[in-house]
Structure formats: C-alpha cells, structure tokens
Amino acid sequence: MANRKSLIKPTLLRSFYVSVVFFCLFVFIGSVTPAAGADNETIPSYGRGPHEVLIFSDYFCPPCRALEPKLEPVLDALYKQGNVRIRFVDTPMHRETPLFAKFYLYAAKAAPDYRSAMRARQVLFALAGKENVFWMDERVEEAFRKEKVAFTPFDFRTVQPELNGMIRKHRVDSTPTCVILSPGKKALKYTGADGILKGLGSLQ
C-alpha cells in the first residue's frame, strides 16, 4: 500500500510534502492548450444511486495496479445495479501522478460515461507499469491516440480545489483507499485490496 510516510519518513514533514505534491498539480498542467469554456469543472461521477463510492488511487502505486483488475468487475456490478455513484479521485503519491490525473480528466471530459472512464483508467494503469519512461504530455497523448481514447484538454487547475479538498476531508494518506458515503450514515473508509473489496461487497 503506497503511503506518504514511505516518501518522507518524518511525520512532521508530511504536511509540507503534501503541499509540495499538490503544487505539482499546477506544474504538470503541461503543453496542451486548454479548451475554452472550462470554468466549472468537477471530478466526474458515474451512476445515480444513493451510495457515493470514492476510489482514491495512484496509477504508479503497485498495490493499486494489482487491485484494479479485481476492482473493475465489482464496480461494474454496482454500477449496473444502479445504487451507487462512483468517483475516481487520483491521489498523488508519486511525482508522475498529476500528469496522469490530468489526462484521466481530459478523457472524462471528452467521453463522460462510465465505460469510457474505465477504459481511460486501464490505459493509464498500463502506461504507469512501464519502466524507465520519462512521462510527458506528448507521450501520454500518443498512447491515448494509439488506444483510441478520446480526450479534451481543459484547465486542470479548475478541478484542483475539489481534488485537494476530498483528499484532505477523508484524510487519505495511502492508496488504494475507498470511502463509501451513504445517506444518514457515517462515512466508511477502507484501505488495501481486501478491505476495499469487502467494503464494496456490502453494497451488493
């Protein structure tokens, strides 16, 4: 399970590190020119059910990559049941993550449906698994075009306040993490593959 303690061990420095990581979200806006009219972007959600499922993950987190093939069929089933709203919250535990998070949101804007979002995540996780690659906008763009993943650039900074706020609100300091929000109930937080799958199973 990836966590910020493994990146900077002294606990007193964790808040400083988090600030630096979120600052990187600005740095990695990249060379693609944003599309006009993207003033009120939000982290997309999929489904209209009463239970909100927040998936906090990092494409460069090995446990997240290992969980993803097991997670997909569970989320698919919940989505088809119609009792959940799913949101993927890319959580920057590695320096390359903001770039990939940006392209996930680009893809979600171009094709705002659940299946397209899952396809974009599949491609991004596969790219993150490649070793010795210096990732930049052009390389992710090339991969998206090759895999026929549509994407629409926009000013990624418009999403950052919501992204940062969700990570802080739910005190997410490791990935993968899942938070389930149900009407009239306390938020339930699960970490690690087994915990997350068990928690999601309670909604089936």
Located regions from the model:
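Short active-site neighborhood of thiol/selenol oxidoreductases, capturing the structured segment around
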Residues: 47-60
